Design a protein with these regions (language model features):
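Short, hydrophobic/aliphatic alpha-helical segments
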Residues: 1-7, 92-95, 179
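Short glycine-rich or small-residue beta-strand-to-loop segments that form or flank ligand, phosphate
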Residues: 3-13, 72-77, 100-106, 187-192
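Short, ordered loop/turn segments at secondary-structure junctions
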Residues: 9-11, 39-44, 78-79, 107-108, ...
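Short glycine/serine/threonine-rich phosphate/pyrophosphate-binding segments
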Residues: 13-23, 46-47, 83-87, 108-116, ...
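Short beta-strand elements in bilobed, periplasmic/extracellular small-molecule ligand-binding domains
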Residues: 36, 68-76, 212-218
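Accessory alpha-helical/coil subdomains and C-terminal extensions
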Residues: 39, 93, 101-106, 112-131, ...
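Glycine-rich oxoanion-binding loops at beta->alpha junctions
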Residues: 48-100, 109-111, 147-151, 156-173
Length: 228
């Protein structure tokens, strides 16, 4: 049987930890993996050959990841694969440790990295399955947009729901503050993240389901911007 490597990138969150917990549980139950490794500090751990053997972690320990904050597993990074040298190094390390499965948890860059590694492994004849575990607050890692408005692969990315919940609470609190001090601050402007897709902005409406709040949602297109 082949070995498996799990790595994460981007912001460390309980959402990522829970996704990794699910991956560990499924891999152990599959009976198709010999050893299970966690890459210390994301893809950097692969490049530096720092693979932590987590095969013998008990089910009780793994279950704790469901509510573990920050990078409660083996760390994260924001390093982007920059060269063919990096890609070749990753494939070399995987071949050395008989890795047949690679799971990379993160956003757009992580999915791109997993795809590049997968393609290079095929070129070199390495029997390697690469999979991305999506985590992004922007909700933009889901494949092509379908006619019904949903995404082809993953309609609600892990990380998006908790972000919207937090934003809704912030808006409700801001509205209460505005009611108390509108004579000096008649209008409050709240800027949110979301890249080009605008799902976080749209989700702000959940703070006011009955449409009683004077809430105006403005997407980047309204200002002729394309990189917000």
């Amino acid at each position: 049987m082949k070995n498996a490597v799990i790595a994460q990138s981007g912001g460390p969150t309980a959402v990522i930890n829970n996704s990794i917990r699910g991956a560990i549980d499924v891999l152990k139950a599959s009976g198709k993996v010999s050893r299970l490794y966690g890459a210390r500090m994301g893809i950097i751990g692969v490049l530096q050959e720092e693979l932590l053997d987590i095969t013998e972690q008990s089910s009780d320990q793994v279950a704790l990841l469901e509510r573990t904050p920050s990078a409660g597993v083996f760390g994260s990074c924001r390093y982007k694969i920059k060269s063919e040298e990096d890609l070749n190094r990753v494939v070399t390390v995987f071949a050395k440790h008989d890795v047949g499965y690679f799971f990379y948890c993160g956003g757009n860059d992580s999915m791109d990295t997993a795809d590049k590694i997968n393609n290079l492994a095929k070129e070199k004849g390495l029997d390697l399955v690469c999979a991305g575990i999506a985590k992004t607050i922007d909700n933009d890692v889901g494949g092509g947009l379908q006619p019904d408005g949903t995404f082809a692969i993953c309609d609600h990315n892990p990380g998006y729901g908790s972000t919207i919940r937090s934003l809704a609470v912030n808006i409700l609190e801001a509205n209460q503050e505005n009611k108390a001090s509108y004579t000096s601050d008649p209008v409050l402007v709240i800027g949110v993240m979301g890249r080009k897709i605008g799902f976080i902005t749209a989700g702000a409406r959940l703070a006011d389901p009955e449409r009683k709040m004077p809430l105006v949602l403005v997407l980047p297109e309204a200002f002729g911007k394309t990189n917000s």
